[in-house]
Amino acid sequence: MKIIKDALAGTLESSDVMIRIGPSSEPGIRLELESLVKQQFGAAIEQVVRETLAKLGVERALVSVDDKGALECILRARVQAAALRAAEQTEIQWSAL
């Protein structure tokens, strides 16, 4: 999946996460993480974001994660929504999700 424009998903409310994703000229996923629980769960949050993008076939992107204590299922859903919006996908491959 090719990221072609900037997109966001989520909110900055408690127990949610705001995901911003945009195109990158360099290969790979560049990830910026801000979280209330970064010391304790930062590595796990980063792993979930990278795994979710890999399942969707995203190979290059700039990703910003502003976490306010979201559960893993919420994090995955927000990453998926932002990536699909950024790729302007109209036909969703549900099996990949």
From Swiss-Prot:
InterPro entries: CitD, Mal_deCO2ase/Cit_lyase_ACP. It comes from the Bacteria. Transmembrane segments: none annotated. It is found in: Cytoplasm. Keywords: Cytoplasm, Phosphoprotein. GO terms for cellular component: cytoplasm. The modification O-(phosphoribosyl dephospho-coenzyme A)serine is found at S14. It holds the Pfam family ACP. Belongs to the CitD family. HAMAP family: CitD. Covalent carrier of the coenzyme of citrate lyase. Oligomer with a subunit composition of (alpha,beta,gamma)6. This is Citrate lyase acyl carrier protein 2. The lineage of its organism: Bacteria, Pseudomonadati, Pseudomonadota, Gammaproteobacteria, Enterobacterales. The gene is citD2.
